[in-house]
């Protein structure tokens, strides 16, 4: 079957899932956006440079995967997909996201790793249900304070960016268990990280850290800190060194 046959069949059957991965697609036919029943759409490994505005018509979508394409931007209409729970955009060429992504308040998992993001919109603070956020291997220089509002976030991946600092508001992530920030330009870690009561693993390799805040000893669930490839000229505070059950990888 050719592409239009596949799409027409899915429309006739009121399909909930459609896999159009690895089809060599450069453009998406308008007929695709007439399948109002769609809840899951896979467009991975194509040659898409953009998503058309009509993507916003698929209002029942719960999962959208457009990984390993050539996307350079997202349309504002992405914000119309308010039922979306899973958004996968890894391995593209996105340099920014529209502010309308803040409308996607039902998101649970978001992967925008391996892009060219320079910044992230403040509206990320609306993603209160997000559990896993992957932003590693981008070109981020800052993270908005609003990320501290993600009360259900368990895993945050910020490794291999250009961050010189991270906001103190990260200390408000009450559910956070895994925080990866290796391969950045960090010289200090905020004292507020000591409030991360569920944090188990903190990876800070390959930064510019001279020491760590003593407050990290207050992270009662902390099992592992990794600080390889840091200057650490001031050493670690005694409270961290003496913390029972803590493995320090350096």
In which residue ranges do the predicted regions lie?
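The feature captures the LRR N-terminal capping module
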Residues: 1-180, 187, 191, 195-203, ...
């Amino acid at each position: 079957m050719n592409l239009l046959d596949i799409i027409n069949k899915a429309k006739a059957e009121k399909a909930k899932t459609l896999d159009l991965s690895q089809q060599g697609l450069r453009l998406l036919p308008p007929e695709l956006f007439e399948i109002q029943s769609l809840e899951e759409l896979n467009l991975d490994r194509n040659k898409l440079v953009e998503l058309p505005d009509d993507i916003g018509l698929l209002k029942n979508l719960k999962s959208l995967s457009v990984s390993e394409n050539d996307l350079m931007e997202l349309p504002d209409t992405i914000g119309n997909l308010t039922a979306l729970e899973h958004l996968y955009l890894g391995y593209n060429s996105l340099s920014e996201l529209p502010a309308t992504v803040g409308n996607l308040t039902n998101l649970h998992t978001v992967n925008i790793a391996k892009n060219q993001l320079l910044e992230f919109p403040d509206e990320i603070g609306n993603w209160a249900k997000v559990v896993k956020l992957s932003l590693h291997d981008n070109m981020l220089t800052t993270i908005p304070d609003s990320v501290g509002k993600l009360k259900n976030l368990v895993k945050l991946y910020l490794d291999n960016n250009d961050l010189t600092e991270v906001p103190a508001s990260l200390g408000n992530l009450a559910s956070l268990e895994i925080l990866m920030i290796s391969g950045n330009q960090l010289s200090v870690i905020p004292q507020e990280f000591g409030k991360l009561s569920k944090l188990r693993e903190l990876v800070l390799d390959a930064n510019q850290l001279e020491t760590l805040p003593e407050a990290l000893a207050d992270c009662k669930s902390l099992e592992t800190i990794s600080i390889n490839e840091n200057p650490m000229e001031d050493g670690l505070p005694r409270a961290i060194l003496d913390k029972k059950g803590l493995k320090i990888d350096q």
